[in-house]
Structures are given as structure tokens and as C-alpha cells.
Amino acid sequence: ALWMTLLKKVLKAAAKALNAVLVGANA
């Protein structure tokens, strides 16, 4: 389903953003 693909993209982007925030906090 298209919405599942979009959901995966959003989750992947959110995970990437969260990871960037965590790395920034640790640095």
C-alpha cells in the first residue's frame, strides 16, 4: 500500500533526525 511506503519514509526520516539530535547532544 502507498500509505505504508509513505509511513516508512516518515519513520526513517524521523529516526534520522532523532539520531542527529542525540549525536549533537553527545558532542
From Swiss-Prot:
Tissue and organ expression note: Expressed by the skin glands.
Main localization of the protein described in the UniProt heading: secreted
Keyword Membrane recorded: no
GO biological-process terms attached to the record: defense response to bacterium; defense response to fungus; killing of cells of another organism
Gene Ontology cellular component list: extracellular region
Disulfide linkage: none
Compartments where found: Secreted
Recorded superkingdom: Eukaryota
Keywords: Amphibian defense peptide, Antibiotic, Antimicrobial, Cytolysis, Fungicide, Hemolysis, Pharmaceutical, Secreted
Residue ranges crossing the lipid bilayer per the database entry: none
Subunit structure: Monomer and oligomer. Forms aggregates in aqueous environments.
Role according to the record: Potent antimicrobial peptide with activity against bacteria and protozoa. Also has activity against fungi. Also shows activity against enveloped herpes simplex virus type 1. Probably acts by disturbing membrane functions with its amphipathic structure. Binds to healthy erythrocytes (this binding is receptor independent), and has strong hemolytic activity. Does not bind to P.falciparum infected erythrocytes, but accumulates within the parasite. Kills the parasite, and only at high concentrations has a hemolytic activity on the host cell. In vitro, shows high spermicidal activities.
UniProt family annotation: Belongs to the frog skin active peptide (FSAP) family. Dermaseptin subfamily.
Protein name in UniProt: Dermaseptin-S4
